[in-house]
Amino acid sequence: MRLHATFAAHVNRYVTIIMDHPRVQAFMAEAKRRNPHEPEFLQAVEEVAETVIPFIESNPRYQGHALLERMIEPERVIQFRVPWTDDEGHIQVNRGYRVEFNSAIGPYKGGLRFHPSVNLSILKFLGFEQVFKNSLTTLPMGGGKGGSDFNPKGKSDAEVMRFCQSFMTELSRHIGPDTDVPAGDIGVGGREIGYMFGQYKRLRNEFTGVLTGKKPAWGGSLIRPEATGYGATYFMVEMLATQGESIDGKTVSISGSGNVALHAAEKCLRLGGKVIALSDSKGSIHDPAGLTEEKLAWIKDLKEVRRGRIKEYADAHEGVTFREGQDPWDLNCDLAFPCATQNELDGDEAATLVANGCKVVAEGANMPCTPEAIEVFHRAGVMFAPGKASNAGGVATSGLEMSQNSLRMSWTAEEVDGHLQRIMKDIHGQCVEYGRLDNGSVDYVQGANIAGFVKVADAMIDQGVV
């Protein structure tokens, strides 16, 4: 692949400048004082501040409004208890959250995550990222995030239903199609969305587009389950096109084996890529021959129906290796999609990826690469797309689902996929516009942050101090 020879040196100088920027340092010192013990949130804020504050200082329109100071404060944080009864008749109690971050350009929009690791720091980080991601789609959606420390794994359908009904009983007070429209995330799929939608309908006596990620039979959009993985792949296509390259013939390594990972793999296969790795929390599989449509269908059944472990794929297929406790980042590949969870790929693993020939990385999960990993990619001249840009396909299609609900009509899969491709192409174009460096290369982190900021900032200025 052709890469700009001076890219790494230019980025090194740029990173040094922004890290030594006194305004950035002062801003982050105050953010840390106000948000102690919230490392994930502060990590997300710092990444944005490092690029947006220099932009503000060079653009008088955005000065004097305390825009970034206001953006990092959620408009509303809701925390509540979620009591429910398990199959043995014992009462269990979990915590529920909804962080309504910013509504300057539309109703709050963002997923619900059910996982034991959920806490306020993680949800604030996700909600803050969502503000910029939703802005990049150009659709009228604000940013929010929510969830619970409930773990659906190992629970019966009846237990999951009772939990979802209890969770929605409180959440229903705070959401609505013109106020806040949640969706799914880790631990929240079609089953959970269905139970919550049913409870909302029961409580409010309204059949309305209050949630996205619904099944098509009752108000959902075609392509929604595939959208995040497909969108990340479409973004990768646009990145490669700037170098005169394509996915065809490239070796692809993907972490995760959930919704995003499997559909990124599916789209890569259809575009001629050779997908050699997937993973879950127990380890990763290496399939040197590459996945096929038949193999991928087997894994989808394993994960979505049987709810099994990726190791079972290695056990059932000759020539496939299961690597217990290992991520796929030490395998030789051309392209990488981190699609599992936040901070899964650190600096050492990034260095290994680079040494093994990886040239382009697109985040499928939210903030899966640590700051150290991103710096390694920049120094090596590896093209890197942050999740707020490359995984925006999911929320973009959620926005399309909202449009279909408002119009009381459904679009074909081809229509939705066409809209998705155009949106991802437009997001890439925005990143290039605001991320173009002096030497002609593109810093996608800078581009995504500034492009996302500008639309929200313009709306906040227009709407006054609220």
Question: What are the roles of these predicted feature ranges?
Answer:
Residues M28-A29, E46, E50, L120, ...:
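Predominant activation on well-ordered alpha-helical scaffold segments within soluble catalytic domains
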Residues A5-V11, V15:
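Short hydrophobic alpha-helical segments enriched in small aliphatic residues
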Residues K32-P36, E50-R61, F128-F132, K153, ...:
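Generic secondary-structure signature for well-ordered alpha-helical cores
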Residues I17-I223, K455-A459, Q463:
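N-terminal ligand-binding/catalytic initiation module
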